[in-house]
């Protein structure tokens, strides 16, 4: 008996010793979030070349590559020329296209007039931050160069390095054993994203798989700004709703640009999809981006996999909506179309008020208005347009949270009306008693002419850039193995949807 007790005691001490050692080792191991908060390198390995995963994961890769089929990138400025006036003085007034597949993220940011036509690595209007959402080469470069080494240069500095469009390593730890075994191995490797998630209580390492799914989408589908004109930063310190972010920007006196007509200190919303989703019925009930946009499907042989052709849930209704909803596809589609119509109709009303406010403010300045007279008016314009852009810039906001969007737009209309009422008083005071004339802005070209843009000149410079600089970037990238030696498209079979 004494021997047994002694043996148990020794075993217990050994187990406790091992446990203490394990706990001590765990305490020494900092999470990626902990490192990001301290602005340290994450110490991770990132394989960013998408083509390297085509052979091992053909179903996922081919479905991802099928986003190349979304070839239409129609101009949002042509569809609604009011945008040109709302963004007068900002690069978005030059060129702003409708969204298309992840496959084109790098191509589209190269092609867009907003990034200019740099002739060398120190030329051009934009910082490196403009690459930050575009692909897995970004977290690789941040890890290699450090945040300062990545964010400080001009956009053209690493054009030959950022060549893989949004892909595998943006969401997965592609070098891990877990990933090699065919498991998701979800990971966020952009330090600024880890910091932002941590700010709103979403420390990535503490999330379960359902939390990690939308968190990886928050790599890009979020509102952000360029702190110190270079660093991508999420304005979530006070919350993610429209009022909290507005308050954050106001308190730090942040301005994206000064409006060319009204001189208002403007904010440009990016794409607050994560923020709006989190406020809607799906977000509140734990239905994530993946559930609706990346369902489980079957290939022709019956093998189940996650479809990486991110698209409209109605395209795979049985595998998406039908897993929760009893209604027919036709019923739900009709409801979503109604949401879209209601939100779009309200949005256009706000746009019309803002266009008039910008031109009326311009007239007030020309009539002799003072800074003191215009101060409250300009802030009302700023807040009204922030609410419009928060609603307009997202992808599918009318579906993700239609009630939030309608409320946001309604408060925007209130602020625009307040600005215009006060402008009427100021204009009258300075002798302007007739309605301010609004030029013909019925087309994109006419609207751009009204604000003095020379688009043919900008397009000619861009065409030269695409013909001379970009091919050199791609040549260098292929030499480094970041792109395959040659690419050949192969047919992609459409997946068969399957209910979960």
Curated annotation (Swiss-Prot):
Amino acids binding heme c 2: 168, 171-172, 308
Cofactor(s) listed: Ca(2+); heme c
Enzyme class: oxidoreductase
Keywords (A to Z) from UniProt: Calcium, Electron transport, Heme, Iron, Metal-binding, Oxidoreductase, Periplasm, Signal, Transport
Enzyme Commission numbers on file: 1.7.2.2
Protein name as annotated: Cytochrome c-552
Coiled coil region boundaries: none
Binding site for substrate: 224, 271
Binding site for heme c 1: 130, 133-134
Xref: NCBIfam families: cyto_c552_HCOOH, PRK11125.1
Amino acids binding heme c 4: 289, 292-293, 400
Highest taxon, organism lineage: Bacteria
Biological source species: Mannheimia haemolytica
Gene: nrfA
Catalysed conversion reaction: 6 Fe(III)-[cytochrome c] + NH4(+) + 2 H2O = 6 Fe(II)-[cytochrome c] + nitrite + 8 H(+)
A Pfam match: Cytochrom_C552
Positions annotated to bind heme c 3: 102, 217, 220-221
CDD domains reported for this sequence: NrfA-like
Signal peptide range in chain numbering: 1-24
Annotated region (Disordered), positions in chain: 477-500
Purpose of the protein: Catalyzes the reduction of nitrite to ammonia, consuming six electrons in the process.
């Amino acid at each position: 008996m004494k021997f047994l007790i002694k043996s148990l005691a020794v075993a217990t001490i050994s187990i406790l010793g091992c446990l203490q050692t394990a706990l001590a080792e765990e305490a020494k191991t900092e999470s990626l979030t902990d490192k990001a908060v301290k602005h340290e390198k994450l110490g991770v390995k990132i394989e960013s070349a998408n083509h390297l995963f085509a052979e091992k994961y053909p179903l996922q890769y081919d479905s991802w590559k099928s986003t190349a089929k979304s070839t239409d990138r129609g101009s949002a400025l042509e569809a609604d020329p009011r945008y040109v006036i709302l963004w007068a003085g900002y690069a978005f007034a030059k060129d702003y296209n409708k969204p298309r597949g992840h496959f084109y993220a790098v191509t589209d940011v190269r092609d867009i007039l907003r990034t200019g036509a740099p002739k060398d690595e120190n030329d051009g209007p934009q910082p490196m931050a403009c690459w930050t959402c575009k692909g897995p080469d970004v977290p690789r470069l941040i890890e290699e160069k450090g945040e300062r080494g990545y964010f400080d240069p001009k956009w053209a500095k690493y054009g030959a390095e950022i060549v893989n469009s949004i892909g595998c390593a943006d969401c997965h730890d592609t070098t891990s054993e877990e990933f090699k075994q065919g498991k998701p191995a979800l990971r966020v490797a952009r330090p600024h994203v880890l910091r932002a998630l941590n700010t709103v209580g979403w420390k990535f390492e503490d999330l379960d798989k359902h939390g990690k799914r939308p968190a990886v989408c928050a790599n890009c589908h979020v509102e952000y700004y360029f702190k110190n004109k270079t660093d991508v930063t999420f304005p979530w310190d006070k919350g993610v709703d429209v009022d909290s972010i507005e308050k954050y920007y106001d308190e730090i006196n942040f301005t994206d640009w000064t409006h060319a007509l009204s001189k208002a200190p403007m904010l440009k919303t990016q794409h607050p999809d994560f923020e709006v989703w989190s406020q809607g019925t799906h977000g509140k009930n734990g239905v994530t981006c993946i559930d609706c946009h990346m369902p489980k499907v079957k290939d022709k042989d019956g093998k189940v996999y996650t479809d990486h052709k991110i698209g409209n849930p109605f395209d795979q209704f049985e595998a998406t909506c039908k897993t929760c909803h009893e209604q027919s596809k036709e019923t739900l589609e009709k409801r979503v179309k109604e949401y879209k119509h209601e939100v779009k109709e309200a949005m256009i009303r706000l746009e019309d008020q803002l266009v008039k406010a910008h031109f009326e403010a311009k007239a007030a300045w020309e009539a002799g208005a003072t800074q003191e007279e215009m101060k409250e008016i300009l802030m009302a314009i700023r807040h009204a347009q922030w609410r419009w852009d928060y609603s307009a810039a997202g992808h599918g906001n009318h579906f993700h949270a239609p009630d939030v969007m309608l409320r946001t737009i309604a408060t925007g209309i209130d602020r625009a009306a307040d600005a215009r009422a006060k402008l009427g008083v100021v204009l009258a005071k300075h002798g302007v008693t007739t309605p301010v004339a609004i030029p013909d802005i019925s087309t994109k070209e006419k609207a751009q002419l009204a604000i003095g843009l020379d688009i043919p000149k900008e397009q000619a410079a861009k065409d030269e850039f695409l013909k001379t600089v970009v091919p050199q970037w791609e040549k260098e990238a292929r030499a480094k193995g970041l792109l395959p030696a040659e690419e050949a498209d192969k047919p992609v079979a459409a997946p068969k949807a399957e209910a979960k």
